[in-house]
């Protein structure tokens, strides 16, 4: 039996653990030849703190209070939240922690009257687009991308990401 996991808003005290989780989770990309992702620096601490201070981050903590996963999100417009990042410590993979973090983001979206949650992810990595599809996310064709999503894509390109390997996805918020 797995230990209970609590999902809660992130605090500044979680920032260092979130960075460690981001680095550890990125190591999976070595398995599929994407070493540049595995070797990338974690999100800048100042940017993490902005998300935390703005109430745009959730963490998953174990029974001992240790952070084992996190999600960053932001409001895109009146109808959409953007799931910026989702990471789970490899030591806690397979326990539905990522799904629970997404459920929390979806609940927040529903509470705020948001119609959908969108994200951008790698198309082929098994723990990326295929995982999100299992959770109900659907792929957005390039023709469906508006200026906001194209701006996100351009930002990713500026970071050195190959957007031909990525896809935008969405999940409509119920209730």
Show which residues each predicted segment covers.
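Conserved GNAT acetyl-CoA-binding A-motif
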Residues: 109-121
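Terminal substrate-recognition subdomain of acyl/acetyltransferases
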Residues: 120, 134, 138, 142, ...
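Acetyl-CoA-dependent GNAT
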Residues: 9-15, 19-90, 102-104, 108, ...
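Short, well-ordered coil/turn elements that cap or connect secondary structure elements
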Residues: 2, 52-53, 134
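Conserved glycine-rich acetyl-CoA-binding loop
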Residues: 66, 89-103, 112, 123-129, ...
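Conserved beta-strand-loop-alpha-helix junction that forms the acyl-donor binding cleft
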Residues: 119-128, 145-150
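Short Asp/Glu-rich motifs
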Residues: 37, 41, 128-129, 151-152
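Extreme N-terminal starter segment of soluble prokaryotic enzymes
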Residues: 4-6
């Amino acid at each position: 039996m797995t230990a209970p996991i609590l999902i809660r808003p992130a605090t500044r005290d979680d920032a260092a653990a979130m960075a460690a989780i981001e680095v550890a989770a990125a190591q999976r990309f070595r398995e599929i030849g994407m070493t540049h992702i595995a070797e990338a620096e974690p999100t800048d601490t100042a940017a993490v703190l902005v998300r935390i201070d703005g109430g745009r981050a959730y963490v998953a903590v174990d029974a001992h209070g240790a952070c084992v996963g996190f999600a960053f999100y932001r409001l895109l417009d009146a109808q959409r939240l953007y799931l910026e990042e989702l990471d789970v410590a490899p030591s806690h993979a397979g326990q539905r922690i990522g799904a629970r973090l997404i459920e929390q983001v979806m609940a927040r979206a529903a509470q705020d009257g948001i119609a959908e949650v969108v994200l951008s992810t790698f198309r082929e990595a098994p723990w990326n687009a295929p995982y999100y599809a299992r959770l109900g996310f659907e792929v957005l064709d390039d023709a469906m991308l508006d200026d906001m999503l194209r701006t996100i894509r351009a930002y990713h390109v500026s970071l050195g990401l190959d957007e031909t390997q990525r896809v935008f996805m969405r999940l409509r918020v119920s209730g």
